[in-house]
Each structure stands twice: as C-alpha cells, then as structure tokens.
Amino acid sequence: TLLDFDEEDGVKTKDPHIWFDVANWKLAAKAVYEGLAKADPAHKEDYKKRYDAYLTKLDETDAYVKAQAESIPKESRVLVTAHDAFNYFGEQFGLEVKAIQGVSTDSETGTKNISDLANFIVQRNIKAIFVESSVPKKSIEALQEAVKAKGKEVKIGGELYSDSLGDETHNTETYIKTVKANADTIVNALK
C-alpha cells in the first residue's frame, strides 16, 4: 500500500520511501524476479530459488522488527527524525512518526517546525530523537537544543539509514541488514 503525504504546496502525492515496508519490498522483489525470468528464461528456476529464499529472509526480517518494536513501551513508540522518511516503517511496526522536514530533504527547516516538535517532545516525554545518514545533523541538534530550552533533555538515539544503505563497517550494506540496524537503533534508544 502506498501512503499519501501533503507536500509543502498542499499537493497530495505518494510517499516515495516504499522500501521501509517489507511487504512493499516483497512486491519489488517479485517484479525483479519476474523481469529476470522473462529476460533470461533459461535461468528462470535459478531466479525462482533465489527469489523464494529472499522472501523467506524478508519474512524473517519482518517478524524480527515487529518483535523488536513490540518491546518498546506503547507510550514510547514515537520516532522523531529530521525528514519524513519513516512513515511506512511506522505504519508497519506501530510507531508514531514525527519529522522536522517533509518527505523531501530539499525542503527548508523552519523555526516553527522545530518549536512545534520541541513542544510535542516535551509534552509526550519522548526519550530520543534520531539523526539520519543522508541528512545533516544540524536540524536534529537544533531540535535537541529547543527541547533543552524548555527545561527537558532528549538524547540523540543514533543514526538511521533513510535514503541509502550503509556499509560493511556498520553491517548495513544490504537492505535486510539496514532494516534490522534501524530497528535495533530505534528500540535501544526508546526502551
């Protein structure tokens, strides 16, 4: 299922971050398998075996992340990031998602956005906010300072991979490893 979002100019469009819902990623994998099987029918069975094995790994990943998310106390299941990339992840795993910016990392971060989100964090007693690998840290650090100015502390819970995979150094060089790493980072900070 594709999620709607409102752009800054009020136009409704679809959230492009489909990969954060494992069910969507399974559909993408199916399209790749079918395309390869059609383009190279001599190896269709090989592609089918790999596709089936990958689906099993995706199902295991989905179950792992759901179990991790359920270990977070319900009142703490709020994911605050720099830009609005995690709506599919939140929808799939039961997290409320808040962001300083919209879906595009090109949009400007306004002081009103930071102030409103700081008020939300204080009111809900949110434990952690998250930086992203593909977005400069300055907006999250500004949010952290805005919360501090209101007499509360909020920690930076770690770095999430939003618009790119990580690398072998961080054990995030594949889709599955990245999804699990994001889940672990979120859970460790919000528990």
Feature annotation, model-predicted:
Residues 1-191:
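Extracytoplasmic metal-acquisition and chelation regions
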